[in-house]
Amino acid sequence: MGIKLINIGFGNIVSANRLVAIVSPESAPIKRIIQEARDRGMLIDATYGRRTRAVIITDSDHVILSAVQPETVAHRLSTKEEVVDEVDE
């Protein structure tokens, strides 16, 4: 099992092995998680000033803001896993 990298928009890449959740930023609990991460210094803003469309939570409690849709990030993750599985066979 190697390192899998996922593009989260604008050339920003995160390790797929570290992802815990990819969620929409619209709900109050997620907004609270974003604010708490900002206060702790654990927020990474990868939106380049654009609207936040996906919030990525990692196993190290970092919260990453992305300007691409959660479905797009999830699709990139599943596509990457399929390609790796085909190479392993």
UniProtKB/Swiss-Prot annotation:
Family annotation (InterPro entries): RemA-like
Short name of any one Pfam family annotated for the protein: RemA-like
Domain of life per record: Bacteria
Protein family per UniProt: Belongs to the RemA family.
Listed name of the protein: Putative regulatory protein CLH_1161
